[in-house]
Amino acid sequence: EICNGLPEGAPLVLNYDDKFLRAAKLPAHVKPVWFSLADENADVCALSIRQEEDGMSFVLEDQEEGTFVVKIPAMGKHNVANALAAYCAATRLGCDPRGVIKGLSNFEQTGRRQKVVHSKGVTVIEDCYNANPDSMKAALAMFKEFPCKRRFALLGDMLELGELSREAHEELGRLAAESGLYCPVSYTHL
């Protein structure tokens, strides 16, 4: 349905890492722009992805515009994917690649999403706004890669899941147990 509203030759930014998107039949009037976290066959891909204490760094390889070193002040590979999607949309609509990368490097998290606070030798990552299964999985994956000696996590409720609530919370518990946490703590009404 999104494609139906796009004019002839419009860029359509798609995740190359999603096998279902790659297999989808796209209308001839759109121009797909593929991004990937690993596959250099995509139009734009991220290489040498590293999680650092204050964000992510990676090499952005754009088949049209060249190669750039990028650092974003956001944690997790999912945010690298978000940055690639934003880069693809902006550059294919005519923005200067260097300006887009500068904008990405100045990105600020909103609300209570992956806010990093350093105090007295302890790093706290607050990521509690509107928790849902995907955001919690991304937070645990990011947390697992974070450079530190011991990891503690306080995990709260994921609301508004209806009949899927128990199953989603149990899955989150399994992921937390497998994530290398020193001490997972959970608070839920279940």
Residue ranges and their predicted role:
Residues 1-123, 148-149, 174-177, 181-183:
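Acidic, Mg2+-coordinating active-site environments of NTP-dependent enzymes
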Residues 15, 126, 152-157:
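Short beta-strands and strand-loop turn motifs
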Residues 80-83, 133-137:
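Amphipathic alpha-helical transducer elements in NTP-driven molecular machines
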Residues 112, 129-136:
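Glycine-rich phosphate/pyrophosphate-binding beta-alpha loops
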Residues 131-132, 159-163:
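Short, small-residue-enriched loops and turns at beta-alpha junctions
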Residues 137-140, 165-175:
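Charged helix-capping and loop-helix junction motifs
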Residues 143-151:
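Glycine-rich phosphate/diphosphate-binding loops that line cofactor/substrate pockets in enzymes
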Residues 188-189:
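Conserved small/polar residues in nucleotide/adenosyl-binding loops
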